[in-house]
Swiss-Prot record:
Residues 11-74 form the S5 DRBM domain. It comes from the Bacteria. This is Small ribosomal subunit protein uS5. One of its GO terms (molecular function) is structural constituent of ribosome. Part of the 30S ribosomal subunit. Contacts proteins S4 and S8. One of its GO terms (biological process) is translation. SUPFAM superfamilies: dsRNA-binding domain-like, Ribosomal protein S5 domain 2-like. The lineage of its organism: Bacteria, Pseudomonadati, Pseudomonadota, Alphaproteobacteria, Candidatus Pelagibacterales. The keyword Metal-binding does not apply. It comes from Pelagibacter ubique (strain HTCC1062). The N-terminal domain interacts with the head of the 30S subunit; the C-terminal domain interacts with the body and contacts protein S4. The interaction surface between S4 and S5 is involved in control of translational fidelity. Belongs to the universal ribosomal protein uS5 family. GO terms for cellular component: small ribosomal subunit. With S4 and S12 plays an important role in translational accuracy. Located at the back of the 30S subunit body where it stabilizes the conformation of the head with respect to the body. Keywords: Ribonucleoprotein, Ribosomal protein, RNA-binding, rRNA-binding.
Length: 170
């Protein structure tokens, strides 16, 4: 598992996985590469992309460009953790993300750690079960994060004030 950091216009890019693809043709083997990349602004925006090319740098560049185009917003609590515990599943990849107190750090493995770092999460506990396939783990993590509701969103649904929702939080 390779990780690569690159700072540019406030967006952090992390290379999560590179895979070599072999196509057998009449004259022999043709090699290609696929790259899985996560990008984020470390303040609640994140994008994930997968791209293929004949050379590794081209695959990474394509994936970065695609990920920048599909940025989504994830609400963060105090800019450091998630609002509540969430569960996500994609294929055989299952993930449980739990909010953590200040100073805990990112307790997560591999691809989930990369997602948390580019998203700007500083305190979280994650447990991944099932597969260790980075594609499925990242998709499961994104599904879990998208299930999350902020107190502002819950307050609008219930027609209450944000302070009423937050004070009941345990």
């Amino acid at each position: 598992m390779d990780f690569k950091d690159k700072k540019d216009d406030g967006i952090l890019e992390k290379l999560v996985h590179i895979n070599r693809i072999t196509k057998v043709v009449k004259g022999g083997r043709r090699f290609g590469f696929s790259a899985l990349v996560v990008v984020g602004n470390q303040a609640g925006k994140i994008g994930v992309a997968h791209a293929k090319a004949k050379q590794v740098p081209d695959a990474i560049k394509k994936a970065n460009e695609t990920a920048r185009r599909v940025l989504i917003h994830v609400p963060l609590r105090e800019g450091r953790t998630i609002h509540h515990d969430v569960y996500g599943k994609d294929g055989a990849g299952k993930i449980i993300l739990r909010s953590a107190p200040k100073g805990t750090g990112i307790i997560a493995g591999g691809p989930v750690r990369a997602v948390c770092e580019v998203l700007g999460i500083k305190d979280i506990v994650a447990k991944s079960m099932g597969t260790s396939n980075p594609h499925n783990m990242i998709r499961a993590t994104m599904k879990a994060l998208s299930k999350q509701n902020s107190p502002k969103h819950i307050a609008t649904i219930r027609n209450k004030k944000i302070s009423d929702v937050i004070e009941k939080r345990g």
